[in-house]
A protein has these predicted regions:
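Preference for solvent-exposed, low-hydrophobicity sequence contexts
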Residues: 1-215
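Extracellular/virion structural assembly segments
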Residues: 2-7, 11-20, 134, 138-139, ...
């Protein structure tokens, strides 16, 4: 009797919600091979009970592969192979997986049709950087599929008047994901003094506020959907240094044996919006985090103290501590502004 999958997974699953798979028609045992994106990640043998065998904890295996390979979307195939010939396989089932480390009260298809791969709908835009905005289209590849057009709406200041410019087709910004800088937006919309940017792709929409001031710190991390996301924060950063020198006594001389030092950066944010609260949570839990310092430098967040409240009237802030992964402090050697440079001719005569 051929092996039958009793409860085949739906075509698109959240990575953390892959159901246990039951196989029927198993005489004694079944040999399985699990492929993710056509890469064999596991081979296992399951013994049968009353003709059935159960494959459990598949979510952990798939999520670990996606994390290790920076994937937000993967295809999973489960094969059966014979004892005497492992190369002879039979495909039992296959399905697609969308990564999400959160529990979402909707299907991945419904969510991805209405949302970008971010928990935020309103964000602060950092003018000095390129923004990446990821999306997944569950209908892509289906028959008669028509890709939605990216629409751009820009709010800008014309003197003291707020005006709006619209670009009906901004698809030039799409390259696997939506990538843009402030100069790209100004060129497309043919405007200056941009204060808001609204991107619409089908039912998905993201609003950016462009501030005149630079954010105190800009972080990048892999968010709940395992894609890169920028997070500019207005915050106060305190530097804490701990150093220890070890000395050794050689005959009558004391010599320096080793020098150890640690530098931690304690961050206290300004009041956060509800969208920023969710992003800070993901930043502190992310396995891959960076801070902007001319380039993105890898860091690790060693501790955090965050008290979040559902009460909107209460200001919500967060505190966390990070350090550079390579242990090297970063410095900026910037030129002084013109009004701070001493330009008077030197007079050697002392009055």
């Amino acid at each position: 009797m051929a092996t039958v999958v009793v409860n085949p997974p739906s075509s698109l699953q959240w990575s953390g919600n892959i159901t246990d798979i039951i196989f029927f028609g198993v005489t004694d045992h079944i040999n399985l091979r699990i492929d993710v994106d056509d890469v064999a990640v596991e081979q296992l043998l399951l013994y049968a009970y009353n003709g059935t065998a159960k494959l459990e904890e598949l979510s952990d295996l798939v999520e670990q592969y996606m994390l290790d390979n920076s994937k937000y979307f993967s295809n999973v195939k489960i094969y059966e192979f014979a004892d005497e010939d492992p190369s002879s396989t039979t495909l039992l089932c296959q399905f697609n997986v969308l990564f999400c480390s959160l529990t979402v009260a909707t299907t991945p298809a419904a969510f991805s049709q209405d949302n970008f791969l971010s928990t935020a709908h309103v964000k602060q835009f950092h003018p000095g950087m390129r923004e990446k905005l990821y999306f997944y289209d569950p209908d892509a590849g289906t028959q008669n599929y028509v890709a939605p057009t990216l629409r751009l709406q820009v709010g800008y200041m014309d003197g003291n008047t707020m005006r709006v410019a619209t670009v009906d087709d901004a698809s030039s910004l799409i390259n696997d994901c939506i990538v843009f800088s402030l100069s790209d937006i100004m060129t497309l919309a043919s405007v200056d003094n941009v204060v808001t940017i609204t991107l619409t792709l089908g039912a998905r929409q993201m609003l950016y506020y462009v501030s005149d001031f630079k954010a105190d710190s800009v972080f990048m991390f892999r968010n709940a959907f395992n894609v890169e996301e920028n997070l500019p924060l207005n915050c106060t950063t305190s530097v804490k240094q701990v150093g220890e020198r070890t000395v050794a006594q050689i005959k009558r001389h004391t010599v320096l044996a080793s020098v150890e030092h640690e530098t931690d950066y304690e961050v206290e944010t300004a009041p956060l919006s509800p969208d920023q609260v969710l992003l800070v949570e993901q930043l502190c839990e992310s396995l891959e985090t960076y801070i902007w310092f001319s380039v993105f430098k890898p860091i690790t967040i060693s501790s955090r103290t965050c008290e979040f409240s559902d009460e909107r009237a209460k200001e919500v802030t967060a505190k966390f501590t990070w350090r550079y992964l390579d242990g090297r402090r970063a410095y900026k050697f910037e030129a002084l502004p013109d009004d701070e440079i001493f330009t008077e001719e030197y007079d050697p005569n002392y009055d």
